[in-house]
Structures are given as structure tokens and as C-alpha cells.
Amino acid sequence: MARITIEDCLKQIPNRFQLTLSATYRARQLLQGHTPKVDAKDKPTVIALREIAAGHVGIEMLKKVPS
């Protein structure tokens, strides 16, 4: 079972709403075939949260969203 806490992610992105959006966009990228930046044994949503907690992905995800 994947153990990732929101508190670990909130250290990187303090706003819960921005954290949710960033994780969502990153998970979508992973589903589209982008390479994970951490161990990829879990589902895309868990991988996205792990990347955020590790500091590999951050708020910049919101700037990459097409308008």
C-alpha cells in the first residue's frame, strides 16, 4: 500500500487547492506517457504526490496547463 501524507506535500505547496490541481495535472501527464521522476510502482495519482513530496514537481505544473 502506498504511504504518502498530504503534510509532506504541503511542505512543498502550502495551498491545498493548488496542491490538488498540481497533482491532478501531473497525474494526467503520467497517464499520457511522461516519464515518472520517482519509483513508478504505484498508480499515477500516487506517483504525482510522491514527486511533489520529493520536490521534483511543484507549483510550476499550473503554468503548463493549456488555457
From Swiss-Prot:
One of its GO terms (biological process) is DNA-templated transcription. InterPro entries: DNA-dir_RNA_pol_omega, Pol_omega/Rpo6/RPB6, RPB6/omega-like_sf. The keyword Repeat does not apply. It catalyses: RNA(n) + a ribonucleoside 5'-triphosphate = RNA(n+1) + diphosphate. SUPFAM superfamilies: RPB6/omega subunit-like (SSF63562). Disulfide bonds: none annotated. Keywords: DNA-directed RNA polymerase, Nucleotidyltransferase, Transcription, Transferase. PANTHER family: DNA-DIRECTED RNA POLYMERASE SUBUNIT OMEGA. Belongs to the RNA polymerase subunit omega family. This is DNA-directed RNA polymerase subunit omega. It comes from Janthinobacterium sp. (strain Marseille). The gene is rpoZ.
